[in-house]
């Protein structure tokens, strides 16, 4: 349960109830996406607790999401694993399996940290507007410089270099009444997905806008952004973030007036 609102998907009694609610959304996501285009989902597997689930372990939430998306017609296209610091996770969650004292007590209950994933789904069909690069956007010389790092870096199945704190500021969105969950997505993750799978001028949609990270990065990169957010404090924070971006884009550097 993330909030007391009945509209919150996280306010579900069970996994079955969550996916029953979520199914209405996945069907519409499939409907509005162009054929051959991409939907990227940021997620992680979920730790269980003895009190809530009856056992200590991990739920395959990533796999459940993939199967749900496949059930409405999506093709499982790709995924990337994003490393997270287990020490930071231990300090934040106090998870039994990450505590060093558990190693001394019974290491059979010790586990590794849980990474983030970006699961990439594709809608079947021919893409009516291909995402391509040109000699102008990727000159041969530039390509020769970045070719190896792209495969080792941007296209690696594990991204080691994502700064977990490189997010929009969420502090203003915390209203103190029903706040139990807010985790803004790291901007470099969004940037890489948009660069790989969209063209300038494309419309990028997010059904869970939060404080506006995806819309912010989309507009910053010359795309259009459309987002839906039910919580008023998050929505206001997203509007503030977009206003700040607009102000930044309108600012003119002193060097623009100088002959360098």
Task: State the predicted function of each range.
Residues 1-237:
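Core catalytic lobe of class I
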């Amino acid at each position: 349960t993330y909030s007391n609102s009945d509209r919150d998907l996280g306010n579900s009694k069970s996994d079955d109830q969550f996916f029953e609610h979520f199914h209405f959304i996945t069907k519409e996501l499939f409907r509005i996406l162009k054929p051959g285009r991409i939907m990227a989902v940021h997620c992680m597997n979920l730790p269980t607790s003895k009190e809530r689930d009856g056992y200590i372990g991990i739920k395959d939430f990533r796999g459940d999401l993939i199967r749900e998306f496949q059930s409405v017609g999506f093709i499982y296209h790709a995924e990337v694993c994003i490393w997270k610091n287990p020490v930071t996770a231990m300090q934040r969650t106090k998870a039994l399996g990450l505590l060093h004292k558990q190693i001394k007590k019974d290491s059979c209950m010790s586990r590794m940290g849980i990474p983030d994933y970006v699961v990439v789904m594709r809608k079947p069909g021919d893409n009516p507007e291909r995402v391509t690069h040109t000699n102008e956007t990727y000159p041969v010389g530039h390509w020769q410089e970045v070719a190896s790092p792209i495969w080792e870096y941007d296209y690696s199945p594990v991204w080691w270099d994502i700064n977990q704190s490189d997010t929009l500021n969420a502090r203003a969105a915390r209203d103190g009444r029903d706040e139990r969950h807010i985790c803004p997505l790291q901007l470099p993750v969004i940037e890489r997905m948009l660069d790989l799978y969209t063209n300038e001028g494309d419309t990028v949609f997010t059904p869970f806008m939060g404080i506006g990270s995806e819309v912010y990065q989309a507009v910053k990169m010359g795309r259009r952004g459309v987002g839906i957010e039910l919580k008023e404090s998050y929505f206001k924070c997203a509007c503030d973030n977009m206003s700040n971006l607009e102000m930044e884009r309108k600012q003119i550097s002193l060097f623009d007036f100088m002959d360098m």
